[in-house]
């Protein structure tokens, strides 16, 4: 049986009760093409002269990798001329990128982390691109877009997805109608539907967290991890395995494939920050995907998708994955407040 391509899937979704606006379909296809270009650059590695770091830092205060900058440029250049967007925002840029006046403007906003997990670039571990699509507020149609127009809760996302650059390059996508996965056919140059109706089991025996930071976590997270480590003889009554790749895309992709819970909690070393991960570029799109796959995502006490953003580069604590495990951690946080 012939497999569907990304274009075929999106056209079918567009025709199906108008579940997908034509502009969003075209926008997703452009993002997917940009991800192919990034995949090619990642795949060349040292042969393409793209490994290593630059002397510059991004707005987060992180030293930029060469591929961070290249991936950001690829996404900007691919998306600014198509007429689907009013503006873009990137984890790598301090301010928003408005569509130049020489190009037509559309009704949507695109946010992205051009290369998540870039600390793994030089050691050849899976990395990825995360993106989120929002509708621009009606009042900005034909007007100047501002940063405030991006500050919408995650539940308002129109689409979200990520590309993972590993042994195979995959694109995982939701438009609010479940989660599907496409594999890049490198010979044909097309995205092919290989994973339909992706779902996360409600229970798990795997957790993903950086255990070296355990002494810095708050009590509810420590309690849950202690119970996982206690195994069959502990209160959870089962043995757990720990996994940690230090690439959110890779860790979440594994959870979508076989279940698990991913945790990047608040850290006492930076008590003034709500967390490490970025709400708009990482937590919101990944939470949308995880919820559409039957999982859950919280910051400890609140559903991630209900958080009202206050800043473009806002950070947040993230606990997502198998629903029953996430809800357990949420209960522990609630109990700690009483």
From Swiss-Prot:
Q: In which pathway does it act?
A: Carbohydrate biosynthesis; gluconeogenesis
Q: This protein's superkingdom?
A: Bacteria
Q: Which residues of this UniProt protein bind Mg(2+) 2?
A: 113, 116, 282
What Gene Ontology molecular function terms does this protein carry?
A: fructose 1,6-bisphosphate 1-phosphatase activity; magnesium ion binding
The note on the cofactor says:
Binds 2 magnesium ions per subunit.
Keywords, in A-Z order: Carbohydrate metabolism, Cytoplasm, Hydrolase, Magnesium, Metal-binding
Q: What catalytic activity is recorded?
A: beta-D-fructose 1,6-bisphosphate + H2O = beta-D-fructose 6-phosphate + phosphate
Q: Which cofactor does it need?
A: Mg(2+)
Q: Which Pfam families does the record cross-reference, listed alphabetically? A: FBPase (PF00316), FBPase_C (PF18913)
Q: What is its EC number?
A: 3.1.3.11
Transmembrane segments in this chain: where? none
Instruction: Identify the residues that bind substrate.
Output: 116-119, 210, 276
InterPro entries on file = FBPase_C_dom (IPR044015), FBPase_class-1 (IPR000146), FBPase_N (IPR033391), FBPtase (IPR028343)
Instruction: Print the organism lineage.
Output: Bacteria, Pseudomonadati, Pseudomonadota, Betaproteobacteria, Burkholderiales
> A GO CC term?
cytosol
Q: Which residues form a coiled coil?
A: none
Look up keyword Transferase and say if it applies. Answer: no
Task: Using the UniProt record, name the top-level EC class of this enzyme in a single word.
Answer: hydrolase
Please list the residues that bind Mg(2+) 1.
91, 113, 115
Natural source organism: Bordetella avium (strain 197N)
Query: What interactions and quaternary structure are annotated?
Result: Homotetramer.
Task: Name the GO terms of the biological process aspect.
Answer: fructose 1,6-bisphosphate metabolic process; fructose 6-phosphate metabolic process; fructose metabolic process; gluconeogenesis; sucrose biosynthetic process
Where in the cell? Cytoplasm
- How is this protein named in the record? Fructose-1,6-bisphosphatase class 1
Q: Which family does it belong to?
A: Belongs to the FBPase class 1 family.
């Amino acid at each position: 049986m012939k497999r569907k391509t990304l274009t075929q899937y999106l056209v079918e979704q567009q025709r199906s009760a108008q579940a997908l606006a034509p502009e969003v379909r075209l926008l997703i296809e452009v993002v997917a093409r940009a991800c192919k270009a990034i995949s090619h650059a990642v795949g060349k590695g040292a042969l393409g002269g793209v490994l290593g770091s630059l002397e510059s830092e991004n707005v987060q205060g992180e030293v930029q990798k060469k591929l961070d900058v290249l991936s950001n440029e690829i996404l900007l250049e691919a998306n600014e001329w198509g007429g689907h967007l009013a503006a873009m925002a990137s984890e790598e840029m301090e301010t928003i990128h408005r569509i130049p006046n020489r190009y037509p403007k559309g009704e949507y906003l695109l946010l992205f982390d051009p290369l998540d997990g870039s600390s793994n670039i030089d050691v050849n571990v899976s990395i990825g691109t995360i993106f989120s699509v929002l509708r621009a507020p009606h009042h900005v149609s034909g007007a100047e877009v501002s940063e405030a127009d991006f500050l919408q809760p995650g539940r308002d996302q129109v689409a979200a997805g990520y590309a993972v650059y590993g042994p195979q390059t995959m694109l995982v996508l939701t438009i609010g109608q479940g989660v599907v996965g496409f594999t890049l056919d490198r010979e044909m140059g097309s995205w092919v539907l290989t994973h339909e109706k992706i779902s996360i089991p409600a229970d798990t025996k795997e957790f993903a967290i950086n255990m070296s930071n355990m002494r810095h976590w708050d009590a509810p997270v420590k309690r849950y991890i202690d119970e996982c480590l206690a195994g069959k003889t502990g209160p959870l009554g089962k043995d757990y395995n720990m996994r940690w790749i230090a690439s959110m895309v890779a860790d979440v992709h594994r959870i979508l494939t076989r279940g698990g819970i991913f945790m990047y909690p608040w850290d006492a070393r930076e008590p003034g920050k709500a967390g490490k991960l970025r709400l708009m570029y990482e937590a919101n799109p990944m939470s949308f995907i995880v919820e559409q796959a039957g999982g859950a995502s919280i910051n400890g006490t609140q559903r991630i998708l209900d958080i009202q953003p206050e800043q473009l580069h806002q950070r947040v604590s993230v606990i997502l994955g198998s629903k029953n495990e996430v809800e357990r951690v949420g209960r522990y946080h609630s109990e700690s407040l009483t």
